[in-house]
From Swiss-Prot:
Glycosylation sites recorded in the entry for this protein: 29
UniProt: Ca(2+) 1 binding residues: 170, 176, 228-230
Record note on cofactor: Binds 3 Ca(2+) ions per subunit. The ions are bound to the C2 domains.
Binding-site list for Ca(2+) 4: 301, 307, 361, 363
Subunit-structure text: Homotetramer. Heterodimer; heterodimerizes with SYT1 in presence of calcium. Interacts with STON2. Interacts with SCAMP5. Interacts with PRRT2.
Needed co-factor(s): Ca(2+)
Organism: Homo sapiens
NAD among keywords: no
Pfam families with a match to the protein in the record: C2
Residue ranges, Cytoplasmic side: 84-419
Protein name (database record): Synaptotagmin-2
Length: 419
């Protein structure tokens, strides 16, 4: 028993582990770290050597390469500086405008007794626009006129008295004004005053009458438009006065001044078209003009039709040498004539003459009114000149072509200019 007790008192020894014991003290890693450092230095040296090799291959001296690098650096710095400056200025401007707008908004709110946010926004908008100059309305002059309505005769009398302070549209610092008077919307009757030469303060003193029932007068607008007459081109509008008749008390005569307003350019009135044929035989010295037909002529009669016929004048240097005319076609705006007329013109004179074609409305009782006019010749323009040139380029062959009719005064002015 004693032996057993002694055996149990023997100390218990732990079994040995298989793991190796770590040495006590600092670990020497100098070998590994030294190897890594050497490899990085080698790589850097190789890259440096490669870079210098590439630079040496460039066919430029070292100072040139340095200069290029300096210039590139300066450009880069300049670009960065400009971008920064622009951004700073923009922020500063936005901040300033915002502060100014808020200040104006607050002022507007104080003046109006504390309005809502919409009023503050309006103040901001007005504050931003303070620097902009307001465009002054153009001064076109003024017109004095009179109105008088005869209730028994259902007749409106319009007096065009005078104009003042008109703008100068001619080269000499003046204008040649006249007035067109008509009622909208129909424009059935259009009057014109006489042209007053070289003046900016014309005295017209002319009256015009319109037969209009009083019940219909309220739906009409009186227009008095002042134009500058030009003999050789389209007349320019100076300004106009519009008077809605439903705004006027016609119980007594009216006389007043009104400022001229900018008027819309008047579209050229469509007068219709005419088809003519030209044929010239140089050896015989014979010019044949055939009036074939016309279409879409202007309505001249009360019934909405016309009684058209055509006059042909052979002219030279502004003088009428010969005259011919067609028969009258009754009550039509699209007459068919097919009538030919011959003129004896030597070849050496053919470039010196003009053929003037006028379409007129026949009136049994009164004067025959011209609907429109054209002329062909070597001094014509547009389709008229082309027609004449085609005729001369194709002797003995009839050449037909359509022409748009023009106002009589416009063609007469061109003929006078070409004398």
């Amino acid at each position: 028993m004693r032996n057993i007790f002694k055996r149990n008192q023997e100390p218990i020894v732990a079994p040995a582990t298989t793991t190796a014991t770590m040495p006590i003290g600092p670990v020497d890693n100098s070998t590994e770290s030294g190897g890594a450092g050497e490899s990085q230095e080698d790589m850097f040296a190789k890259l440096k050597e490669k870079l210098f090799n590439e630079i040496n291959k460039i066919p430029l001296p070292p100072w040139a390469l340095i200069a290029i690098a300096v210039v590139a650096g300066l450009l880069l710095l300049t670009c960065c500086f400009c971008i920064c400056k622009k951004c700073c200025c923009k922020k500063k401007k936005n901040k300033k405008e915002k502060g100014k707008g808020m200040k104006n908004a607050m002022n507007m709110k104080d003046m109006k007794g504390g309005q809502d946010d919409d009023d503050a926004e309006t103040g901001l908008t007005e504050g931003e626009g303070e620097g902009e100059e307001e465009k002054e309305p153009e001064n076109l002059g003024k017109l004095q006129f009179s109105l008088d309505y005869d209730f028994q005769a259902n007749q409106l009398t319009v007096g065009v008295l005078q104009a003042a302070e008109l703008p100068a549209l001619d080269m000499g610092g003046t204008s040649d004004p006249y007035v067109k008077v008509f009622l909208l919307p129909d424009k059935k009757k259009k009057y014109e005053t006489k042209v007053h030469r070289k003046t900016l303060n014309p005295a017209f003193n002319e009256t015009f009458t319109f037969k209009v029932p009083y019940q219909e007068l309220g739906g009409k607008t009186l227009v008095m438009a002042i134009y500058d007459f030009d003999r050789f081109s389209k007349h320019d509008i100076i300004g106009e006065v519009k008077v809605p008749m439903n705004t006027v008390d016609l119980g007594q005569p009216i006389e007043e001044w009104r400022d001229l307003q900018g008027g819309e350019k008047e579209e050229p009135e469509k007068l219709g078209d005419i088809c003519t044929s030209l044929r010239y035989v140089p050896t015989a010295g014979k010019l044949t003009v055939c009036i074939l037909e016309a279409k879409n002529l202007k309505k001249m009669d009360v019934g909405g039709l016309s009684d058209p016929y055509v006059k042909i004048h052979l002219m030279q240097n502004g003088k009428r040498l010969k005259k011919k005319k067609t028969t009258v076609k009754k009550k039509t705006l699209n007459p068919y004539f097919n009538e030919s007329f011959s003129f004896e013109i030597p070849f050496e004179q053919i470039q010196k003459v003009q053929v003037v074609v006028t379409v007129l409305d026949y009136d049994k009782l009164g004067k025959n009114e011209a609907i429109g006019k054209i002329f062909v010749g070597s001094n014509a323009t547009g389709t008229e000149l082309r027609h004449w040139s085609d005729m001369l380029a194709n002797p003995r062959r009839p050449i037909a072509q359509w022409h748009s009719l023009k106002p009589e005064e416009e063609v007469d002015a061109l003929l006078g200019k070409n004398k």
